[in-house]
């Protein structure tokens, strides 16, 4: 784990400069061959090493809550009915401005490492994707932190449109809510293209339930925990199809019940129904995580199950049975 607090603005600026070629419309994409992350892939890397196929499962653990993301939004958009799993073609940008100790990506794949990445255009990525004998119905733009290179999404949308793939491919991206680059660097037309693209969904991750757990998880300034809510609110008010993840790892449980209640309050101040579009993620140990874990991390992984029980209690207190029976896509925040 990092012991010094990350200068998020400085890291964001540095990694953006290394990870995007705006005139050439290229983004720095990880190549998984020969990396530590390759050991955790359920299938060999594809797309000449620049891609991986991920199988999203609604329920991976009997000890944790079901996760309908991105299965339900993708199936709804593509008319695929209900499903327990979905295959996705994953492309991973090679930079991140935070260092979450539980991240399944090795830290040396988050620092614009040119030994394991190359600058590629969306056209080149789609060429690789379409060369697969069975291209998955969904493309997942992940990282890293994709929003250090926010142009990646509208560029990919343009390329999908050019190839007449808009009705057969669902596009998904994630965001760690660490910067305002969506607003700072995209043009009005690019933002409008994202908003107007029917088969696109976006998930953003809240990295803890309070400032203490946030700083512990990310190594970032605790004040940026509050900024996460402001950034998410802007996306909702803009009209994107937004979903949320959250992690419940906290180094101790002192005050955690009250902190969790306040966390849900803050979600509801963005929109009263946002907790129903928020999915807690279970933190487990992937290969790169093993060398980072100390006693505080072990405690945090145990504590997440207690906090998850508080989460369930809060939702039962605030919502009715009819709310819980809804498909997550039918929780309307617009």
Region roles according to the model:
Residues 106-139:
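Conserved alpha-helical substructure of the radical SAM core
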Residues 141-145:
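Glycine-rich beta-strand-to-loop/alpha-helix junction loops that act as flexible
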Residues 126-130, 147-277:
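Conserved AdoMet/S-adenosylmethionine-binding subsite of the radical SAM
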Residues 13-92, 101, 105-110:
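N-terminal [4Fe-4S]-dependent radical SAM core
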Residues 92, 96-101, 198-204:
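Short coil-to-beta-strand
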Residues 103-115, 215-222:
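Acidic/glycine-enriched edge-of-secondary-structure segments
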Residues 1-47, 223, 230-334:
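Auxiliary Fe-S-binding modules of radical SAM enzymes
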Residues 110, 146-147:
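Short strand->helix junction
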């Amino acid at each position: 784990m990092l012991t010094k607090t990350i200068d998020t603005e400085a890291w964001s600026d540095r990694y953006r400069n290394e990870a995007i070629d705006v005139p050439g419309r290229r983004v720095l994409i990880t190549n998984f061959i020969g990396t530590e992350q390759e050991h955790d892939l359920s299938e060999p890397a594809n797309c000449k090493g620049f891609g991986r196929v991920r199988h999203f499962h609604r329920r991976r653990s009997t000890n944790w809550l079901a996760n309908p993301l991105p299965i339900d939004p993708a199936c709804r958009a593509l008319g695929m009915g209900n499903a327990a799993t979905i295959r996705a073609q994953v492309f991973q940008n090679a930079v991140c401005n935070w260092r979450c100790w539980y991240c399944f990506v090795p830290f040396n794949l988050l620092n614009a490492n040119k030994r394991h990445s190359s600058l590629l255009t969306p056209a080149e990525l789609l060429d690789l994707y379409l060369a697969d004998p069975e291209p998955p119905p969904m493309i997942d733009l992940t990282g890293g932190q994709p929003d250090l290179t926010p142009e990646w999404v509208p560029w990919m949308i343009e390329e999908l449109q050019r190839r007449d793939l808009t009705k057969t491919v669902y596009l998904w991206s994630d965001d760690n809510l660490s910067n305002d680059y969506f607003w700072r660097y995209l043009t009005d037309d690019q933002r409008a293209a994202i908003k107007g693209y029917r088969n696109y969904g976006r998930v953003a991750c809240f990295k803890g339930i309070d400032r203490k757990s946030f700083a512990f998880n990310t190594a970032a300034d605790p004040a940026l925990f509050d900024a996460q809510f402001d950034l998410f609110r802007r996306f909702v008010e803009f009209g994107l199809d937004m979903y949320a993840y959250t992690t419940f790892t906290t180094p101790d449980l002192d005050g955690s019940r009250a902190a969790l209640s306040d966390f849900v309050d803050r979600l509801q101040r963005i929109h009263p129904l946002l907790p129903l579009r928020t999915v807690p993620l279970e933190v487990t140990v992937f290969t790169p995580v093993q060398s980072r874990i100390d006693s505080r991390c072990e405690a945090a992984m145990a504590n997440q199950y207690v906090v998850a029980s508080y989460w369930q209690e809060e939702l039962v207190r605030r919502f009715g049975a009819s709310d819980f029976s809804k498909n997550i896509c039918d929780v309307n925040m617009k």
